[in-house]
Amino acid sequence: MFVGEYYHSLDEKGRLIIPNDFRQLLGETFYLTRGFERCLNIYTITDWNNFSQIISSFSPTDNLMRKLCRFWFSGSIQVTTDKLGRILIPSFLIEYAELSKEVVIIGAGKHIEIWAKEKWEEFNKEENILENMNEINSKVAELWKK
């Protein structure tokens, strides 16, 4: 599982150091894709393939799933770390996530998220998890029963 919060800098060429703890779990090659909250997500090859199989299995007549497939596949690239543990983030993903020099890399369980520092701080203010704790606890309790 990916856990933790790391503050790093995106260099002028769009390169970002992936924390060593994360690299050990990811391996050298993995997938970088658009996230659902204007962040970027990193998945192991196995998890990316599993999710890709799931969304590809829906009927091609399902308009919503076609939109998800377009979003997912067009916004995904396979990346490999260099000798310094950096990845090169393409400009279209930098623009999507509105990344600037300061970024936050967080562990989110089965994947990693890359956020613009300002957006991460804003998200944490807006999405006060403590205000939703009763609803969250109910969902977790349901999962524990299974």
Curated annotation (Swiss-Prot):
The lineage's top-level taxon is Bacteria
Where's it found, cell-wise? Answer: Cytoplasm, Nucleoid
**What taxonomic lineage is listed for the species of origin?**
Bacteria, Pseudomonadati, Dictyoglomota, Dictyoglomia, Dictyoglomales
Q: Which GO terms describe its cellular component?
A: cytoplasm; nucleoid
Keyword Transferase carried by entry = no
Can you say what this protein is called?
A: Transcriptional regulator MraZ
Q: Which InterPro entries does the protein's record reference? A: MraZ (IPR003444), MraZ_C (IPR035644), MraZ_dom (IPR020603), MraZ_N (IPR035642), MraZ_sf (IPR038619), SpoVT-AbrB_dom (IPR007159), SpoVT-AbrB_sf (IPR037914)
Molecular function (GO) terms for this protein are:
DNA-binding transcription factor activity; transcription cis-regulatory region binding
